Amino acid sequence: CIDDTVTKSGSRLLYQYLLAPLVDIELINNRLEITKFFYDNLSLAETIRKSLGKTADLERCITRINMQRSTPKDLLSIKYTIEIAEKIMADFIVLKGVNLDKNIENIIKPLLGLHPLYEILDESIREDSPNSISEGKIIKLDYHPRVAQLHDLLENGRSKIEQIRD
């Protein structure tokens, strides 16, 4: 089997590589340098493979969000995947310091700047969110005072109406 990838995204990328092989010698050499880097750093490669195996299929999550068919699970999956990506970046830096090969830097560069998104998801989305948006109880009550107020109205609306009537 030629596909020894650990993620759906990796399988799709491999498929694209096989469907449209590189013809530019510089790009071929860049890919060979990346391969050599991981061959020379097998423990890092194995650590990254294990980490990648725990990630969500971000392409699918983002597609569902764009099609307005996402669930809270998609948002949490993105959050967890960002957390894993940050760990992978830290593994690179621990191994090689801040002076990484330009090809490896090009792999890591898209991961930079994701922490603010992680923070928003971590601060706002409940870990115990239901699978459906229509069920509610997705946003943490302490995320914003208005959310807590609306939640209180949903939960205690009848009793508040009764109090007003009395």
Where are the predicted features?
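Alpha-helical bundle segments enriched in helix-capping/polar residues
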Residues: 1-166
